[in-house]
Amino acid sequence: MLTLSDFDFDLPPELIAQTALPERSASRLLEVDNTNPSAPPRLVDRRFAELPACVAPGDLLVFNDTKVLKARFFGRKASGGKIEVLIERVTGERTALAQIRASKSPPPGTTLTLADAFDVTVGERVEPFFTLHFPDDCLVLIERHGRLPLPPYIEHAPDAADETRYQTVFAANPGAVAAPTAGLHFDDAVLTALEARGVERATLTLHVGAGTFQPVRVENLAEHRMHSESYELTDALVEKIAATRARGGRVIAVGTTSMRALEAAARDAQAAGRPLAATRAETDIFITPGYRFRVVDRLVTNFHLPKSTLLMLVSAFAGIETIRAAYRHAIDARYRFFSYGDAMLLTRRDDAAEATHGGA
């Protein structure tokens, strides 16, 4: 049985990308060809702008169109004590769930002043979050007064460049507190080239929560509990997936968030004895080696943190030894890692079930 230690690796800190490159598609792309089970994976160093040449006419790229909220606030209690608030999820026009850092947890009814601009009232506790009641439309106040919540491994304060580059060019539905980072590499030129090649596009929405950065703290992976995120698949997406299958094309998830939404919906549909359909739901799906993929054939993804659930996901998809070889190559070749880093193109290995604790 695989354990947390199986997903550890040493990463030189200078390979953690601190800023985005000047051009989105100037990032590097490691194409991983692992389709021959009797041979080591073939690793091809490319530029991301070459992605259209790596996919086929009739394939379908599925993007996550979530938009990152300016979800971080600094503020104070009525006593003057300093607080930090990170919005986790907008739950209504004037309500949201949030993490609150303070010297003492604020009880219900507490008034907090955020960004020296407006007051919110603390409502009920929904572990591990607090309900916040806003005086007006939360999305408007968040966009106007909040700060972009860059990942904890990015060391600079967010600036104007981040406000553009930590969003995808197709972001449309506000609600995430972290970017679907595989999508950050796509610019208009790449999207136009994909269209010219006859590659289809579709979107879904999964609002990425702050839990995406939470470390796994248990050695036995079966004991880990994933955070929950909301997602939505539309009729148009489901129809495009069916049409892609009918013509022999491949479904390519852009990012692990797209992957998780597609696979969660397909797993739940199968459990209910029905075909994949449009849905709006919550998922805490935890994909580890042994998981049987139902929808996704290929995956565009960034390089992930050691011991992270996302590293486990890509290992389940492509095979743990394939991922180890690819990461060793990426480190030796000085690829850039994490949110502002470079990308990989992976192909599903149906024999990648090298452990069985991932479940069906």
Swiss-Prot record:
Pfam families noted in UniProt: Queuosine_synth (PF02547)
Any one GO cellular component localisation term in the record: cytoplasm
Coarse class of the protein's main subcellular location: cytoplasm
GO molecular function: S-adenosylmethionine:tRNA ribosyltransferase-isomerase activity
Keywords assigned by UniProt, alphabetized: Cytoplasm, Queuosine biosynthesis, S-adenosyl-L-methionine, Transferase
Class in the EC hierarchy, top level: transferase
GO biological process: queuosine biosynthetic process; tRNA wobble guanine modification
Compartment(s) of residence: Cytoplasm
EC number: 2.4.99.17
Pathway: tRNA modification; tRNA-queuosine biosynthesis
Catalysis performed (reactions): 7-aminomethyl-7-carbaguanosine(34) in tRNA + S-adenosyl-L-methionine = epoxyqueuosine(34) in tRNA + adenine + L-methionine + 2 H(+)
Family from the record: Belongs to the QueA family.
Subunit: Monomer.
Function according to Swiss-Prot or TrEMBL: Transfers and isomerizes the ribose moiety from AdoMet to the 7-aminomethyl group of 7-deazaguanine (preQ1-tRNA) to give epoxyqueuosine (oQ-tRNA).
Annotated protein name in UniProt: S-adenosylmethionine:tRNA ribosyltransferase-isomerase
Organism: Burkholderia pseudomallei (strain K96243)
Recorded name of the encoding gene: queA
